[in-house]
UniProtKB/Swiss-Prot annotation:
Its EC number is 3.1.-.-. SUPFAM superfamilies: Ribonuclease H-like. Its main location: cytoplasm. This is Putative pre-16S rRNA nuclease. GO terms for cellular component: cytosol. The keyword Protein biosynthesis does not apply. It is found in: Cytoplasm. Could be a nuclease involved in processing of the 5'-end of pre-16S rRNA.
Amino acid sequence: MERISALGLDIGKKRIGVAGCDGTGLIATGLTTIERTSFQSDVEQLHQWVKEREAQILVVGLPYSMDGSLGFQAKQVQKFTRRISHVLQLPVEYVDERLTSVEAEAQLKSQKRFSTWDKGAIDRQAATIILQQWLDSRR
């Protein structure tokens, strides 16, 4: 089986949830949550994870509207993703991320690992779900 190293991203206005996968491309794991302050800071932190994980691709959750259209937030995510893809010199694949934050919160609550104060945990878990969906679709 071909080795794959991907980073899953749940991009929001305030935070970016980051997930990575094992070398076999079977299991996604939450890595960190980046608190967004500036584009430069976002890029620097993502670049560190790309280097550390030897990432070959970015898998980004795209927040489609419930009717399947691309709303304002989805277009903002695409715009940001085009910029980071260019700077980091990595290809991007999008995954439909509708309801991943709801699913992430439910998973964390069921695992008793949820605090209403830790929004970053939801973002990390959402990034994990996004990346896992992409990994599963490749099998």
